[in-house]
A protein has these predicted regions:
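Contiguous, structured surface segment used for ligand recognition
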Residues: 1-88
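Feature activates predominantly on carbohydrate-active enzymes
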Residues: 51-197
Length: 197
């Protein structure tokens, strides 16, 4: 697939790798297609396919991936036009990563790709004690936790797909699982609340 941009080249570098990833997920997609992409300020997604050319006009990177996903699933048609008005500036999903165990990094990446294909641009990771805290081994004990490097990796991956990663980190309360362990008395106020200094 040849991608031609009629707008700023910075978007090209951002979506080139993500486009390859999404196309690789669609087995059998090896069509010789020219893809023309233009970013605009209006909250619309426009797709126009004529034979071996697809024109996509959109506002955000995640909208581009929604349009690309639509085009991939309508490739058997010689020609089509599709238009959609984007109703929300921010639209996405919150994953609760504090119930039993955290999602693997690969599963979160899969969900990021899915959100992009749906045109969504926000992923919130709700974490109570499932993140790394230096010197506090009981955070995420026996449940898993995200390291700083994993959160950075997920943030970079999400950015490539136009998705904002928002780590919703509990820093004062809802920490029952971490504070139940011996040795946490110095920082515990009550069963699930930290003692601020």
């Amino acid at each position: 697939m040849n991608i031609v941009f009629s707008s700023d080249k910075k978007e090209y570098n951002t979506i080139k790798k993500g486009t390859k990833i999404l196309l690789a997920e669609n087995d059998g997609f090896n069509q010789n297609i020219e893809l023309f992409v233009k970013f605009q300020d209006r909250p619309e997604i426009l797709i126009n396919k004529r034979k071996k050319q697809i024109h996509i006009i959109c506002r955000e990177i995640s909208h581009y991936y929604r349009a690309l996903n639509y085009a991939i699933h309508h490739m058997e048609e010689d020609e089509f036009q599709y238009q959609e008005h984007v109703c929300f500036e921010r639209n996405g999903l919150m994953l609760d990563c504090s119930r039993n165990a955290v999602f693997t990094v690969e599963k979160v990446k899969f969900l990021i790709r899915t959100l992009a294909k749906l045109g969504m641009n926000v992923l919130m990771l709700y974490t109570e004690d499932t993140y790394e805290v230096e010197g506090q081994p009981y955070f995420g004990a026996y449940r898993g936790k995200y390291t700083k490097d994993e959160i950075k990796e997920l943030d970079a991956y999400a950015s490539m797909f136009g998705v904002e990663l928002v780590p919703c980190i509990q820093t004062l309360a809802h920490l029952h699982n971490a504070l139940k362990w011996p040795g946490m008395d110095k920082i515990r106020d009550s069963a699930d609340i930290l003692q601020p200094e």
